[in-house]
A protein has these predicted regions:
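Extracellular glycan-interacting surfaces
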Residues: 1-181
Length: 181
């Protein structure tokens, strides 16, 4: 079909291995909200063929995604029930954050008690340069969080508009978030 492609990320060391995060949108409407129609896909042949690697993970709608260039090459993906999930919804966005250390074969939640699921939706997502397996995540409530590989959440910044993207430089420890938009 014509998938709702959000992001494509190459594996840092395996030539031809790609990961894609997708949603339910289609050129001809909206796909049925079932497993296989949204989530994460992996290609091992430069994108010629794709395998669904998001089986059993909910919510399925996946958008922000990043992969750590350091071993074990953690792939982190944020997901929500729909493209329109928001902190303004009754019950909040119901967003989740997942990580795989084996190219999407297995996934584990990076959410703590407060974020399982999260009332805020996750839009900005990048690798934390200060911690292998850690990420920085931006929310639709104007917050940026540092999330460790052990799923410990630390508030880095707040009081901003919705954080749609994050750039963290190599020397980010002294000034954790270099650019937030």
């Amino acid at each position: 079909g014509n998938p709702d492609l959000h992001m494509i990320s190459p594996h840092p060391t395996k030539r031809g291995v790609l990961f894609a995060s997708t949603g339910y949108g289609r050129l001809d409407g909206v796909a049925e909200m079932i497993e296989g129609n949204a989530g994460v896909f992996r290609s091992q042949d430069f994108g010629n063929n794709w395998d669904y690697v998001w089986s059993g993970v909910t919510p399925r709608y996946s958008r922000p995604m990043c992969i750590d260039s350091r071993d074990p090459f953690s792939l982190t993906v944020a997901s929500a029930p729909t493209a329109f999930s928001s902190f303004k919804d009754e019950g909040g966005a119901q967003a989740m954050l997942f990580r795989s250390d084996n190219e999407g074969q297995d996934w584990r939640s990076l959410c703590d008690e407060k974020h399982s699921p999260s009332a805020a939706n996750f839009h900005g997502l990048t690798v934390d340069p200060d911690e292998i397996g850690g990420v920085l995540v931006g929310t639709d409530t104007g917050e940026v969080w540092s999330v460790s590989k052990e799923a410990t959440w630390t508030l880095v910044a707040e009081g901003m508009p919705a954080v749609l993207s994050i750039f963290a430089g190599e020397e980010a420890l002294s000034e954790k978030v270099k650019s937030v938009t």
